[in-house]
Amino acid sequence: MISDSIPKELILEIMLRLPAKSIARFHCVSKQWASMLSRPYFTELFLTSSSTQPRLLFAIKRNGLWCFFSLPKHQSPYDNSSSSLVVAADFHMKFLPNKIQMYSSSENRKLSCCYASGLTYFYDMYSEVRVICNPITGRYASLPYLKRYRKELSFFGFDPIDKQFKEWLKYAYSLRDDKFFTHDVFVVRVTATEMNTIQRVEIQGFGECQHEYDYYRSRVVYVFADHVEDLDVNDPKLLESKEEEEEEEEEEEEEEEEEEEEEEEEEEEESKEREKEKKIETVIGGWIKQYWACFLRKSWELNPHR
C-alpha cells in the first residue's frame, strides 16, 4: 500500500528514475502499485524520461533463448572515459516454438530487429514472421501476414500523435550493420559516428566456444538504439543515406547494364566467329567436292571400261 505520508507525485518521480527491471518487479507489490505503474500516463512519462538518456540494448540468441543486455547510463558508449565495458543480462526470454516458428538450422537465415518505446520488433525474412515483444514482461505477439516486396526493409516505430505502434515498410534513414566477433571474449563494438570513436562492450555469460561450428551457429547479435528524435522525411540531411543507397543501386544497375552489353558483344563476336567458320567450312567443302569430281572424271577418262 502506498504510504499516505509520501505524496503520489514524489513516488512517481522516484519511479521514473529507476530501471525498467525494477518497475516490472514493483507490479507485484500490490494491486494499487500495479494499477499505478500500468497506466498509460506513467508509461509515457517513463519512456519520455528514458529517451533523454541514450542507451543501447543488445539482444543475443543462444540455443533458442534470447538474452537482453541494457547499457547503463554511466557507461554510455559516447563517453570516452573508458575503452571497455562489461554488462550482464537484464532479461531472458524464449518464444514458444508451437506458436511462433522463428528459428531454423539454415545458416542463411536473416532476422531484422528494431526497437521503439520499450518494445522490440523481430522480423524473420525467411518465413516472413513478424513478432513484437516486451522483454520486461516477457509478453509477445505476432503481427498479421503482410505482403512483402523485393528489396523491402521493415522497421518498427511509435507514433506519438495517436499513441499507436506502427510497422514501417518504408524508411527515411538506414544504418549500417557491422559485426565483430572474438573467440576469447564475447564483445560488441559500438561506433559513435559523430565523435569517430569505437567503444568495446563485453557481454558476460558467453565464454569461449568449444567448436568453431557451434560459435557461428548458436550466437547472433542484434543492436538496438534507444533514442527518440523528431525526423523530417523531407530533410535532405536525413535522406543522405537513402540517396547514397539509391546511388549505389544506380551504379550497380549501370554495372549490370555494362556487363550485359559486354556479354551481348561477346555473343555477337562468337556468332560472327561461328558464321565465319561455317563459311570457311562451306568453301572448303566446295573445294573438296570439286576436287573429288575432277578426280573421278580424270579416272574415268583414263580407264573408261572400268
Swiss-Prot record:
Gene3D superfamilies assigned: 1.20.1280.50
Domain of life per record: Eukaryota
Region (Disordered) residue spans: 235-278
CDD domains: F-box_AtFBW1-like (cd22157)
Biased composition (Acidic residues): 242-270
Listed PROSITE patterns: FBOX (PS50181)
Residue ranges occupied by any F-box domain in the UniProt entry: 1-45
Identification of the protein by name: Putative F-box protein At1g47300
